[in-house]
């Protein structure tokens, strides 16, 4: 059974359950430990959601809408994902996680979608926990991507899928070496991947919220298969 390191966040349970139901073992990674200790004995890394990343990490001044930045977490997770890739560990990055992944490798972020992207959809759906799996908008998925392969049973019209949404930031300039694997109808980047890595995928929505019903279990199963392969 592959051991998945899951970065600590305020809402851990759905991430934990998603990994368990896909056949993995969970080890929570606290930001207080060393990078070496965090990676010891794990077969894959799952980056979780959370607060905004400090814009200084990608060379920008903070927009007024950027709040609740956690500098220590930013520093730790950026170093962690770089070390994980150096060690060829499979990586699945969710919500804030996709943003950490992009920033760690030289990309930038849209700091506030409502004020910086004209004609944007509503991406920050404020819903109670029991409705966290409600769909918010469609995605357009690149046909030859890892994401498309994993989500083939979920796609409508060959390349679209509905997802939930709870974010006000997004990938802006893509990190070198990565490719876009999904976008929202308004052009917001919703998934990225690194084609040269064994498994390195970031998604902006919250597939973990669907662990009870299994709509996105294939994402976690694909991640765990890569972790097993080592």
Question: Across the structure, where does each feature detected by a protein language model lie?
Answer:
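Residue-level marker for buried hydrophobic side chains located in beta-strands
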Residues: 201-203
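N-terminal beta1-alpha1 cap of cysteine-dependent amidohydrolase-like domains
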Residues: 1-92, 102-110, 114-155, 159-162, ...
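Conserved G/P- and acidic residue-centered "switch" motifs that form tight phosphate/ATP-binding loops
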Residues: 95
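The feature captures the ABC ATPase H-loop/switch
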Residues: 98
């Amino acid at each position: 059974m592959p051991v998945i390191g899951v970065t600590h966040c305020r809402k851990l349970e759905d991430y934990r359950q998603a990994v368990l139901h896909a056949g993995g073992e969970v080890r929570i990674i606290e930001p207080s430990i060393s990078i070496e200790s965090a990676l010891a004995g794990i077969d894959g890394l799952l980056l979780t959601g959370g607060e905004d990343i400090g814009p200084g990490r990608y060379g920008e001044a903070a927009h007024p809408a950027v709040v609740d930045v956690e500098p220590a977490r930013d520093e730790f997770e950026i170093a962690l994902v770089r070390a994980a890739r150096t060690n060829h560990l499979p990586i699945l990055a969710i919500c804030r996680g996709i943003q950490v992944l992009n920033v760690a490798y030289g990309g930038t972020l849209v700091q506030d979608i409502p004020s910086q992207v004209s004609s944007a959809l509503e991406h920050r759906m404020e819903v109670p926990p029991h409705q966290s799996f409600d769909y918010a908008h469609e995605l357009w998925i690149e046909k030859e991507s890892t994401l498309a392969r994993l989500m083939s049973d979920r796609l409508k019209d060959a390349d679209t899928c509905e997802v939930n949404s709870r974010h006000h930031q997004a990938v802006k300039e893509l990190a070198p070496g990565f490719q876009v694997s999904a976008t929202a109808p308004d052009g917001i980047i919703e998934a990225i991947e690194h084609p040269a890595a064994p498994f390195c995928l970031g998604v902006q929505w919250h597939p973990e919220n669907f662990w009870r019903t299994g709509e996105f279990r294939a994402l976690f199963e694909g991640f765990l298969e890569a972790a097993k392969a080592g």
